[in-house]
Amino acid sequence: MITQAMIENFPSSPGVYLMKSADDTVIYVGKARNLKKRVRSYAGDTRDSRIHIRFMVQLVHSVDYLVTDTEKEALILENTLIKQHRPKYNINLRDDKTYFSLRMDMKEQFPRLSIVRKIPSDGARYFGPYASATAAKEVLKQLYKMFPLRHYPLATCMARKRPCLYHQIKQCSAPCCGLISAAEYAALAQGAALFLEGKNNEVARLYRSKMNLASEQMRYEDAARYRDLLRAIEVTVERQKMVAQSGDSDVFGVHREADRMQIALLHIRGGTLTGGRSFLFDWELETEEGLASFLNEYYDLDAPIPPQVLIPLPIAEPAALEELLSEKAGKKVTIAVPQRGPKLEMVKLAGKNAETAAQERLARESSSATLLTELAEKLNLPHPPRRIECYDISNIQGEMAVGSRVVFIDGRADKSLYRRYRIKGVLQSDDFAMMREVLSRRFKADSHEEKPDLIVVDGGLGQLGVLNAVLDELEVTGVEAAGLAKSRVARDMESEEIERSDERVFRPGRKNAIALRQSSAPLLLLVRIRDEAHRFAVTYHKDVRSKVLTGSELDGVAGIGEKRKKALLKHFGSLKRVKEATLEELKGAPGMTESAARALVERLHGGPLPNPPPPGEGAMGDGSIPSPRNGVMDDSIPSPSGRGWPKAG
């Protein structure tokens, strides 16, 4: 418990405080404008009625602090310490979802829109964000109908001899074939940029003036093109829901249920709702403090920062967070709590989204709880298995063997907990030994990780026996085990299926499989988990096999690293064509040097090449060029067809 004596010498300056348990573990990190005043609010004589706060404070054995010069520094330090210690009562937001944006470089010849993940400072214009690649592609699809910009990279486009298929369906203006002038194309690109920024009136004015000018100059085909563009824009704008007066903003809504907080985020770009996200996390302190901590962590994950952030309730020290976000964004950022008007309506909409997401989550959890309870009954487990892990092995006759682990939490896949294993200690084709290695590495190396309630292995009694042996050897307790054997298919002489056996579930201590109806929800869950482990293992095995088969002949060549290797494969199209290329062709590839090309030829064809002649001299040393007539074909550069290449000894 925090006492007045603990904080007697605390300063009244900005800083960060760390609450620690009896074993010196940091359980909470907070920031404050006034350290002494803030920590005193948690002291033993507090009459805070919130049970969850009183419970956390009871666990505090000591409090440390770090002083900073400003509130902004305290905010940065708090975020750093949360990442370092991962305290139990802080938000540990680990967001692996990537935002997508549309990129257009107006300085490029015939600018093109492309989908990107990162937004570097390269002078190009970026539009978004979009929550998924699908959303970004849908925007592009609609945009091309209004603004027929080129689809392909410039080099590919300009190398064409005739217009592409997109031109035939009126979604490309074919600048590659000169079917549109540079000025007209620039107007298209500018219109697309304005449209993506939500400046629809400016787009309409731009094209209306160009339509009138073309009509006055009797360029009626151009005038008709601008007329069609205007109509397409008007139809699209009518379908869009304008949700704000103008500008870009992120709108947050909060829904609180006991110690769980649901936050909904709506992205407003150019006054239009472009997408949204939802976040759920455990939080046992004040809602305002949770929202402030969430904003700090969320925007620290390289999320796009708009000029305005709208929130449903005030947070402590918003000026410090505004200063920090402005510094990151390179522009002024404001945090506001709307009181009326369209912005307040948007905050209410975000709150409604948060509440709906919470209700859907509760419904899913209720359904999952029922399913896991039924699974526990069928398999005779002591309690419903909240965390289920499944392991699988993939190899070709013992070669390039790999293992996989997938994890399901409350009946749903948690891909952040997936693991891949490269088999190291088993050289022969022995699936049992490989499974033993994977399981041993999981419980030795990952002993700090949360134990599963149930482990499922892909296999019958044999694999289940390996799993039990490993658990016994490593003295792992409290973990249940099951084996899921694939159904067997009998086929006739023409490979037609004539009989399919049932999926079978085995448990320790039983010789026979547990009888489960093949369409039952518990069995279908186990099959889904097993199939996901198999998919993950096979995907990894293909990656390993691909690297071994395609990379071995180019790896280790002097002067050829990863970049040159990729450039060669891209330039020639395949490893086969690289091997068939002449020395001159290899030297002419992008980024290649003569020494690297010679080293590659020697590696691929098993013998040294003759040294190049000194400048001004032929291969004969007297200025002449070797030819078949003077009988020195052995000194010429061999042909790529294999006729004349030195044979490998």
UniProtKB/Swiss-Prot annotation:
Alphabetical UniProt keywords: Cytoplasm, DNA damage, DNA excision, DNA repair, Excision nuclease, SOS response
Compartmental location: Cytoplasm
Sequence similarity: Belongs to the UvrC family.
HAMAP family xref list: UvrC
Function in brief: The UvrABC repair system catalyzes the recognition and processing of DNA lesions. UvrC both incises the 5' and 3' sides of the lesion. The N-terminal half is responsible for the 3' incision and the C-terminal half is responsible for the 5' incision.
InterPro entries for the chain: GIY-YIG_endonuc, GIY-YIG_endonuc_sf, GIY-YIG_UvrC_Cho, Hlx-hairpin-Hlx_DNA-bd_motif, RuvA_2-like, UVR_dom, UVR_dom_sf, UvrABC_protein_C
Pfam family, one: UVR
Protein's name according to its UniProt entry: UvrABC system protein C
Known partners and oligomeric status: Interacts with UvrB in an incision complex.
Domain UVR stretches: 201-236
One GO biological process term: SOS response
Chain positions covered by the region annotation Disordered: 603-649
Entry keyword DNA repair: yes
GO (cellular component) term, any one: excinuclease repair complex
GO molecular function, one term: DNA binding
Species name: Geobacter sp. (strain M21)
PANTHER family named among the record's database cross-references: UVRABC SYSTEM PROTEIN C, UVRC/OXIDOREDUCTASE
Record carries keyword Electron transport: no
